[in-house]
Curated annotation (Swiss-Prot):
Intrachain S-S bonds: C71-C84, C129-C157, C142-C169
Self-association and partners: Homodimer; disulfide-linked. Hexamer of two alpha (GNPTAB), two beta (GNPTAB) and two gamma (GNPTG) subunits; disulfide-linked. The alpha and/or the beta subunits of the enzyme constitute the catalytic subunits.
Location of the DMAP1-binding domain: 176-279
Compositional bias ranges of the Basic and acidic residues kind: 295-306
Subcellular location: Secreted; Golgi apparatus
Keyword list, A-Z: Coiled coil, Disulfide bond, Glycoprotein, Golgi apparatus, Secreted, Signal
Gene that this sequence comes from: GNPTG
UniProt protein name: N-acetylglucosamine-1-phosphotransferase subunit gamma
Source taxonomy: Eukaryota, Metazoa, Chordata, Craniata, Vertebrata
Stretches of the chain forming a coiled coil according to its record: 239-266
Biased composition (Polar residues): 38-49
Molecular function as annotated in GO: protein homodimerization activity
Organism of derivation: Bos taurus (Bovine)
Length: 306
């Protein structure tokens, strides 16, 4: 009873003091920071990224598959880059601004193969950047540990990443041939023999070799409008840089000279477009009796008469 009376006295004492002064305000205690805004830094970064598609299946050297499911980060300046091999590359601005940038720089797409060696991983179909999608190339280099060592942007919307790993230190760790199943290895062996026997041209060899890599899942099948399918892309785009266009032109010029040499060697007449009157270009062409069948350059097969 005494305790109840004491409590009642305390309550009456506070009530007697009257309301708080006009200048005072009640303080509201906030236990958690707000998470309003798409790019709020307190929001988990992965929850606000919307990829355009799923990544391609894991492929390539079997010993690299252990990198799948792992992520490696690097902070440069005010940005944090995160590489998840065989998944994607993301970029996050390290700031508390409400509109801090977070985006996808590419989703795992295919390998880059040069001289029959895995040279890099292409991450494509990232977030929109001007008139196209962001994309990244990941170069694998030998290192003491798995780590994302460097990130740069050599051209607009195209990023270059260097990933160090002890998994590629062996000189044969990135060779393509040993990773292929037996059936595709046999196709490659036959292709090499056909090239030696001059049953196919160099162009046909490269085309057939790419088909082997596509069947293995290392490269994606090229589509006519693949570049245009990227958001905001330009229709009919074939070369991303002037250097790649010049290299392709040089390779075609060399192939033309080589084929002209073969025709001359076998006595097959041919005319240069610059020396042929315009009327002959558009007029009907009547094949000459006994003339050897011309080379069929697209499939890369040579005529039997050669």
């Amino acid at each position: 009873m005494a305790a109840r009376l004491a409590g009642l006295a305390v309550v009456l004492g506070f009530a007697a003091r009257g309301p708080a002064p006009g200048g005072a305000a009640k303080m509201k205690v906030v236990e958690e920071p707000n998470t309003f805004g798409l790019n709020n830094p307190f929001l988990p970064q992965t929850s606000r990224l919307q990829p355009k598609r799923d990544p391609s299946p894991v492929s390539g050297p079997a010993h690299l598959s252990r990198l799948s499911g792992k992520c490696f980060s690097l902070v440069e300046s005010t940005y944090k880059y995160e590489l998840c091999p065989f998944h994607n590359v993301t970029q996050h601005e390290q700031t508390f601004r409400w509109n801090a940038y977070s985006g996808i720089l590419g989703i795992w797409h295919e390998w880059e193969i040069t001289n029959n060696t895995f040279r890099g991983m292409w991450m494509r179909d990232g977030d929109a950047c001007q008139s196209r999608s962001r994309q990244s190339k990941v170069e694998l280099t030998c290192g003491k540990s798995n780590r994302l060592a460097h990130v740069s942007e050599p051209s607009t919307c195209v990023y270059a990443l260097t990933f160090e790993t002890p998994l590629v230190c062996h000189p044969h760790s990135l060779l393509v041939y040993p990773t292929l199943p037996a059936a595709l290895q046999q196709r490659w062996d036959q292709l090499e023999q056909d090239l030696v026997d001059e049953l196919i041209t160099a162009q046909g060899y490269e085309k057939s070799l790419r088909a082997i890599f596509e069947d293995a899942g290392y490269l994606k099948t090229s589509e006519p409008n693949e570049a245009a399918q990227q958001e905001g892309g330009t229709k009919g785009l074939r070369f991303e840089t002037l250097e790649s266009c010049q290299e392709a032109h040089k390779a075609l010029s060399q192939e033309i000279k080589r084929l002209q040499g073969v025709l001359t060697q076998h006595g097959v007449p041919y005319g240069k477009p610059t020396e042929t009157p315009s009327s002959e270009h558009w007029g009907p062409q009547v094949p000459t009796a006994g003339m050897a069948e011309p080379l069929r350059g697209d499939p890369g097969l040579r005529g039997d008469t050669l």
